[in-house]
Amino acid sequence: MDMVKRFTVYLVNLDPVVNGKPRTSRPCVVISPDEMNRYLNTVIVAPLTSRKQDLPTRVPINFKLKPGQIALEQIRVLDKSRLIKPLGKLGDNTRDEVVRILGEMFSGG
């Protein structure tokens, strides 16, 4: 697999069984830094969802002409083998909002 880049949206296999045929896949954005992505076999991702909720951890997104949200309260660590294929990248404004909210979530304030 090519280098996994931060802020790239992938179709991800979220099914508990890795070696079987994927039954549960959804788009997720990679939020782990490129330095981690380069050296580790895992990535940190947040799922995209079309089910909107008014939460401070949600980032609005219009990806592939579909409105939705990035659910930062549902971040998870996955093995890179679960990344099925890249779907695109986040725009600059969306990236900035993801970084801002992650900073608030983990700043301890």
What kind of feature is each model-predicted range?
Residues 1-109:
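Conserved functional hotspots at enzyme active or ligand-binding sites that engage polyanionic ligands
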